[in-house]
A protein has these predicted regions:
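Short polybasic amphipathic segments
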Residues: 92, 282-287, 324-326
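FNR/FR-type flavoprotein reductase catalytic core
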Residues: 2-14, 130-290, 294
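Hydrophobic structural packing positions in well-ordered secondary structure
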Residues: 60, 87-90, 107, 138, ...
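Local cysteine-cluster metal-coordination motifs and their immediate loop/turn environment
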Residues: 170, 310-335, 343-358
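Short flanking/linker segments adjacent to small metal-binding domains or redox-active Cys/His motifs
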Residues: 359-364
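C-terminal accessory/binding modules appended to enzymatic or scaffolding proteins
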Residues: 279-316
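Ferredoxin-reductase
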Residues: 44-140, 144-145, 157-158, 185, ...
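Iron-sulfur (Fe-S) cluster-binding modules
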Residues: 1-52
Length: 364
């Protein structure tokens, strides 16, 4: 059975029809080289908060409370939005204390003309806290185009959806895609949370395919839980998303069960492997700006650059959104997620999950 992927975009509003010829005219390559797009975007924002040459801006239609610490923000993007597939995410940009900050959030719902972000407020979350306390219906939010490959294939749909905590957000979008397509296969959906009160989308989680396991013991996954609710889990292709503890436990279970059906996953929160401290300092040089700093530590390059007073572009900080990706011209880095070393020149690396193992030159 072929399942729908991209949803149709809505008809543009009168305002968008009027501004679109201007936008496309100004985006001629020659004009791009003459204009500072940032300044033009700022000018257009002053005329209308949804107007931009390059940025997707989204009107906040409504804000829905899901749990005590989770809200859903329903958005209508402007004419630059290219659509999305269930399971993908966007980067949300906000200005705080004079700096533009970016975080990656999954799309929990995609309908013609609207998308929804379901965001849990993190205890120390600068951006999530700002969105929860400040963002209201009628505001305008800057987002990226949809990104990510945690999407359903046209064939071989999943037989098991497994999530915990806020990992339910992309998984819920995948489930809705299946339901909207008329999928009549044998689907099971197991979600784990600390309590019923912590269950995101409680009002939408009816149906015979859904099993909710609430546990007071840290909301942790166990093999017994899976075996109890889904006895034939080994035979089910599985889509998985959740915090690091869930990801590690499930990946460990699948690794010890070679006959298990395929597992597809997206991680919420990076499980970084510690790199060994260096015996002597190494130099990290930025070839374009001329900036440089020395380090003997094993922290990601992004954190060390910020500690040295350098402001670098970044987003999720966990290796997902690739906002901090740059080209390594020379030197060796270690991927703190996989432990792999990369010494080849002119390779793309993500600063938030890369630690220097030698002198480095970065194209920044």
């Amino acid at each position: 059975m072929t399942m729908p992927t991209d949803l149709p975009l809505p008809a543009p509003t009168l305002t968008e029809r009027l501004i679109r010829p201007l936008v496309h005219g100004l985006r001629h390559p020659v004009v791009d080289n003459l204009l500072r797009l940032g300044a033009v975007n700022d000018t257009l924002r002053g005329l209308h908060p949804m107007w931009s040459l390059t940025e997707v801006r989204a009107h906040v239609l409504r804000v829905e409370d899901e749990t005590a610490d989770t809200k859903t923000f329903v958005l209508r993007p402007n004419a630059l939005w290219r659509g999305a597939r269930p399971g993908q995410h966007v980067r949300v940009q906000v200005e705080l204390d004079g700096r533009r900050r970016s975080r990656a959030y999954s799309l929990s719902r995609i309908t013609p003309g609207e998308v929804a972000l379901t965001i849990k407020r993190q205890p120390q979350g600068l951006v999530s806290g700002h969105l929860h306390s400040q963002l209201r219906a009628g505001d305008v939010l800057t987002i990226s185009q949809a990104q990510g490959d945690f999407v359903l294939p046209a064939a071989l749909p999943p037989k098991l959806l497994l999530s915990a905590g806020s990992g339910i957000t992309p998984v819920m979008a995948l489930r809705q895609q299946l339901l909207d397509s008329g999928y009549a296969g044998d689907l099971r959906f197991l979600h784990i949370s600390r309590s019923r009160a912590d269950l995101i989308f409680a009002r939408r989680l009816g149906g015979p395919d859904v099993q909710h396991h609430a546990t007071a013991v840290n909301g942790r996954f166990s093999t017994d839980t899976l075996q109890t609710w889904v006895p034939d889990w080994q035979e089910r292709s599985t889509w998985l998303c959740g915090p690091a503890a869930l990801m590690d436990a499930v990946h460990g279970l699948w690794a010890s069960t070679p006959a298990a059906a395929p597992l597809h996953s997206e991680r919420f929160g990076a499980a970084l492997r510690p790199a060994q401290p260096l015996g002597s300092p190494v130099q990290v040089r930025f070839s374009r700006s001329g900036a440089q700093f020395s380090t003997t530590g094993s922290a990601p390059r992004l954190l060390q650059a910020e500690a040295a007073g350098l402001a670098l572009k970044h987003g999720c900080r966990i290796g997902i959104c690739r906002a901090c990706q740059c080209t390594k011209r020379s030197g060796t880095v270690q991927n703190l997620q996989t432990g792999e070393l990369c010494s080849a020149p002119d390779q793309a690396i993500r600063l938030c999950i890369s630690a220097a193992r030698s002198d480095l030159t970065l194209d920044l």
